[in-house]
Amino acid sequence: LESCNAYESRCMSDVMGCTLRPGEFRLTKKAVEFCHITSEHKILDLGCGMGASIGFLYQNYNMKAVGIDPSEKLLGIARENCPSARFLSGTGDFLPFENDSFDFVLAECTLSLMNDIGKTLREVRRVLNNGGWFAITDVYAKKPDEAETLRSSPVVSCMRGLHDLEKLQKNLTDLGFHICILEDCSDLLKELMVKIIFQFGSMDVFWNKAAGSQTCETGTLFHQKIKQCKPGYFLMICRKDEYYG
């Protein structure tokens, strides 16, 4: 089946705005303030999309961040929105940066999109300075065994990669990350779903529009698989252990 990048669909930005995720900037703000990030720190936005968080950080904290994303369409919008920022085309499993390049890495509803999460986590660890911070906001499955049915879906969305939180925590700690915060934020996902239903009439209609191409798996089937997993949303803040390895 032909894959469909739901993030390039107009209906996604219509309902989520430029952030393309639940909660807008609420968790971005919380992560930045918890980690005491300042304008002196080097920041990477992993899966920057249209550059929403990079613009937010600059406008509210005078912070300059680097963004990386595989979508040239979204990067084009990002460069228009934030002309002074640096944006690169790429994926998380091969970050084009030297070791110890950043103090803070953001992955806001993007880690679930990575083709190889294990390799991406190793790359994040590599480019982070010792003691550097890794902030993740993303979707997870309360019934992770059901999530395997989504992996082969051609609909490119974070929902395709719902996390198993226990596995994610183990992967991070095995790499020498210390998990400082793990907070359930499923209310933000519910809030977004209510907004979608109000605007589109149902989640089925929304996913059918987001899937777009007729050669894609129908949004209705995709939504049925999502419901079986009982999705939630979380904030996790980790720190690279300077004594690891």
Placement of each model-derived feature along the sequence:
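Conserved alpha-helix/loop element of class I SAM-dependent methyltransferases that forms part
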Residues: 21-39
